[in-house]
């Protein structure tokens, strides 16, 4: 899908639907996380675990995550510097490539694609 800068709400709705579709897990690779992304992730179903992989975990982000977990639970941030692009993996079965950070969706033109690869290809590299 392709979104123009005026399609902020449409981009937000699409991401919300994808987040709500998760029944078990969400993996997010995005180096530009802030509280707006946590707000989007608060729409997850109860019991869904979230792991965010980010290059640097700021003190502010850590505080925001602690508050998120107090109310919604099951969110973990992990320092990870190997990814330049942004990816969203749902239930270890679907993987999306994001042309923009979740916090910036709809601010400028960007593309959003579902990849036809097995998410295990990426998830299997996390422990190595």
Language-model features, listed with the residues they occupy:
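PLD/PLD-like phosphodiesterase catalytic module centered on the HKD motif
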Residues: 1-12, 21, 27-128
């Amino acid at each position: 899908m392709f979104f123009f800068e005026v399609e902020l709400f449409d981009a937000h709705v699409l991401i919300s639907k994808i987040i709500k579709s998760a029944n078990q897990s969400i993996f997010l690779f995005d180096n530009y996380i802030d509280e707006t992304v946590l707000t989007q992730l608060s729409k997850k179903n109860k019991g869904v675990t979230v792991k965010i992989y980010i290059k640097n975990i700021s003190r502010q982000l850590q505080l925001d995550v602690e508050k998120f977990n107090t109310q919604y639970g099951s969110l973990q941030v992990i320092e990870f510097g190997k990814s330049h692009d942004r990816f969203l993996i749902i239930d270890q079965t679907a993987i999306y490539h994001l042309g923009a950070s979740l916090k910036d969706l709809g601010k400028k033109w960007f593309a959003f694609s579902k990849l036809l690869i097995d998410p295990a290809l990426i998830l299997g590299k996390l422990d190595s």
